[in-house]
């Protein structure tokens, strides 16, 4: 799968970038424990599954970010989702 970046450049999809962005948002609010890291890794995996189910060849950054927000909120990480949203703006 490929990603269409904000500047229009096409890049290979890298799930670790999603995970790192979520961690950055989380560490503004919480101390990153192993349990929290594992839970956020599961959120990342669910986003990857959502993307695979969407069957798009080239996902946009905004599509991926919306999926991340949805999964964070669904997992009860409301504060992390708020910081993730502000981080991406």
Predicted regions, residues:
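Long, C-terminal-biased catalytic regions of enzyme "large/alpha" subunits
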Residues: 1-89
């Amino acid at each position: 799968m490929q990603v269409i970046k904000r500047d229009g450049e096409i890049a290979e999809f890298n799930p670790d970038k999603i995970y790192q962005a979520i961690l950055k948002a989380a560490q503004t609010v919480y101390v990153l424990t192993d349990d929290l890291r594992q839970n956020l890794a599961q959120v990342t995996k669910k986003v990857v599954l959502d993307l695979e189910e969407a069957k798009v060849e080239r996902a946009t950054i905004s599509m991926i970010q919306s999926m991340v927000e949805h999964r964070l909120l669904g997992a009860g990480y409301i504060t992390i989702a708020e910081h993730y949203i502000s981080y991406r703006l």
